[in-house]
Amino acid sequence: MLDIQFIREHTDIVKESQRKRGESVELVDEVLSSDTARREALKAFEEARAQQKEIGKKVASVPADEKAKLIAETKELSQTVAEYKAKADSAAEEYTTAMWRLSNIVEPEAPEGGEDDYVVVKKVGQIRDFAAEGFEPKDHLTLGAGVAGIDMRRGVKVGGSRFYFLRGQVARMQIAMLTMAVDQAEEHGFTLAITPTLVRPEVMRGTGFLNSHADEIYRLREPDDQYLVGTSEVALAGMHENEILDLGNGPLRYCGWSSCYRREAGAAGKDTSGIIRVHQFDKVEMFVYAKQEDSYKEHEHLLAMEQEMLAKVEVPYRIIDTAAGDLGSSAARKFDCEAWVPTQGRYRELTSTSNCTEYQARRLNIRERMEDGGTRPVSTLNGTLATTRWLVAIMENHQQKDGSIEIPKAMRAYMGGKEVIEPTKWEA
């Protein structure tokens, strides 16, 4: 949610942000109109109530012959007050509804355009020349089957499309990767949290995911009115809902480990095989509560953390600055790290890090205590540190001619010193 005072004073900036996102510019006028109606209705209600109280005070002190008249006026005014109260409540509801539909203000540096209008910030690593090595690279699904590590057939049998089993050494590789991510996060001062994967509607709405991504989210049927999270960002944001934080010693940094669930409603025909786009996966997510003036520095820090992790798994990648029209409603700016996938001949997203400024904090009422005793909303930021999809890039970029998979050096200590995952037959 945005600051209404900012919207009043900088209407053009908010409208320009909506335009860059490809969202309704007229919504800004709707917010301002409902704001005016809300304030006018509230003023009328408060004036009528004050008048009612004033007359009520006089009843006890006036002569008996005047009391009947004042009592009649009080009753009549009570009806007026009730009507004004109803109008004020209705106006407040319309205002809140409009405000919650507004997306965060895009940072001026974010590129304009849609999904394909990102800007490549830099490329890191050397893309392998498999032709020079004398063999055609296998895709991750073929490699996974060859080492008895990815079972899509039985995953579909159990859960339906886009489900899978990770088994054996590939399952161990995921655990190793996620554990390595947690260790790195803790080394940088993040606190590990195993988070809930079911959240209340108020928390999901507060993070902004019900604005533009509602169709991607699983929701439990009544009477259990809860949502399955697509990232631990949701739970970590809700953890300090309605709290006042002490950021005097620096940002609060969390590292969330959770299973994640996504409907992939808009993904018909995309990545229908393999584990790139699935309904359930595991992820380690960074989440930060920071002072408003520190959010940009923290955003750079999260991006550096992602790059450090990518260096450990030794895959070529690039960083892109996401265009305004491809930002989620909460993000003011977002950077993605995309790894090279040899068999697809293109880069695929592995991480994203977003600066949500005060947008989520205002919606969830999360503030910090200031030195003067006052409070103000904090900034929230998030970033991926490792997720199931990383296995695709690791397996394909580290494959050998015989179908084996070389384990990245940094991960070997997490796999008992093992250096290579050898081809093996299914036991069952």
UniProtKB/Swiss-Prot annotation:
Catalyzed reactions per annotation: tRNA(Ser) + L-serine + ATP = L-seryl-tRNA(Ser) + AMP + diphosphate + H(+); tRNA(Sec) + L-serine + ATP = L-seryl-tRNA(Sec) + AMP + diphosphate + H(+)
Residue positions binding ATP: R262, R263, E264, V278, E349, L350, T351, S352
Record: residues binding L-serine: T231, S232, E233, E285, T384
Compartments reported by the entry: Cytoplasm
Enzyme class: ligase
EC number: 6.1.1.11
Pfam families: Seryl_tRNA_N, tRNA-synt_2b
Gene3D superfamilies: Bira Bifunctional Protein, Domain 2 (3.30.930.10), Serine-tRNA synthetase, tRNA binding domain (1.10.287.40)
Highest taxon of source: Bacteria
InterPro entries in UniProt: aa-tRNA-synt_IIb, aa-tRNA-synth_II, aa-tRNA-synth_II/BPL/LPL, Ser-tRNA-ligase_type_1, Ser-tRNA-synth_1_N, SerRS_1_N_sf, tRNA-bd_arm
One BP term from GO: seryl-tRNA aminoacylation
Gene Ontology terms: cellular component: cytoplasm
Record bears the keyword Transmembrane: no
Keywords of the record: Aminoacyl-tRNA synthetase, ATP-binding, Cytoplasm, Ligase, Nucleotide-binding, Protein biosynthesis
Gene Ontology molecular-function annotations: ATP binding; serine-tRNA ligase activity
Biological or metabolic pathway of the protein: Aminoacyl-tRNA biosynthesis; selenocysteinyl-tRNA(Sec) biosynthesis; L-seryl-tRNA(Sec) from L-serine and tRNA(Sec): step 1/1
Subunit structure: Homodimer. The tRNA molecule binds across the dimer.
Recorded domain comment: Consists of two distinct domains, a catalytic core and a N-terminal extension that is involved in tRNA binding.
Known function: Catalyzes the attachment of serine to tRNA(Ser). Is also able to aminoacylate tRNA(Sec) with serine, to form the misacylated tRNA L-seryl-tRNA(Sec), which will be further converted into selenocysteinyl-tRNA(Sec).
Family under the similarity heading: Belongs to the class-II aminoacyl-tRNA synthetase family. Type-1 seryl-tRNA synthetase subfamily.
Protein name: Serine--tRNA ligase
Species whose genome carries this gene: Bifidobacterium longum subsp. infantis (strain ATCC 15697 / DSM 20088 / JCM 1222 / NCTC 11817 / S12)
Lineage: Bacteria, Bacillati, Actinomycetota, Actinomycetes, Bifidobacteriales
UniProt gene name: serS
